[in-house]
């Protein structure tokens, strides 16, 4: 959002009260970067509060936005309006089950409300898969979307809980400490990843 507008607080202020909004550099910054460096593969982190001017800036830039599956099943929403439901993903987007700042998919499903878990089941049309295996069907959801790119954290491929979470924003201590072990890269996992990426035409042989 800071590229569109940012909150300016005078130096020496004890609180943010004297601050005010300033216009950011906008699309001209990205045009200058492109002119200097050429086309670059940039993903717009368009999460959280989005004003219409920010949305327009993302559209003008042409950068793909982010679509996070874990944001899709808020029980306060109704119908299919959520931009984070996979059938609403545009081609020019990058789809994630979750990011480094989110819970793992397994723990997220365990911690949402029963109403939200019901929404997930309804959306999947799946009332039989054991909860411990449901993460695989949720990964398949975003692979079936129109998003040009899908990014699945290794913790979600492995079906791990929050003990493998990367980062919890605004906290200190155990963040950024999880490491993938060689022993976790099994032939079974390789076969599962190969199968789903091939099935949905997302195998990149380049």
At which residue positions do the language-model features occur?
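Catalytic cores of glycan-processing enzymes that make or break glycosidic bonds
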Residues: 1-206
């Amino acid at each position: 959002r800071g590229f569109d507008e940012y909150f300016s607080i005078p130096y020496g202020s004890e609180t943010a009260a004297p601050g005010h909004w300033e216009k950011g550099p906008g699309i001209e910054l990205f045009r200058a970067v492109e002119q200097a460096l050429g086309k670059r593969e940039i993903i717009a982190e368009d999460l959280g509060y989005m004003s219409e001017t920010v949305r327009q800036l993302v559209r003008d830039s042409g950068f793909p936005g982010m679509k996070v599956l874990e944001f899709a099943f808020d029980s306060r929403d109704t119908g299919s309006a959520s931009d984070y439901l996979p059938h609403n993903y545009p081609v020019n987007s990058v789809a994630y089950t979750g990011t480094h700042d989110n819970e793992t998919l397994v723990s997220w499903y365990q911690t949402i409300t029963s109403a939200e878990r019901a929404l997930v089941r309804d959306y999947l049309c799946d009332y039989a898969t054991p909860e411990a295996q449901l993460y695989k069907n949720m990964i398949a959801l975003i692979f079936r979307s129109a998003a040009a790119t899908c990014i699945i954290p290794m913790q979600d491929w492995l079906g791990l809980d929050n003990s493998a979470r990367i980062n919890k924003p605004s906290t200190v201590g155990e963040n950024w400490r999880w490491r993938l072990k060689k022993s976790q890269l099994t032939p079974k996992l390789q076969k599962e990843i190969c199968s789903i990426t091939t099935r949905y035409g997302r195998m990149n042989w380049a």
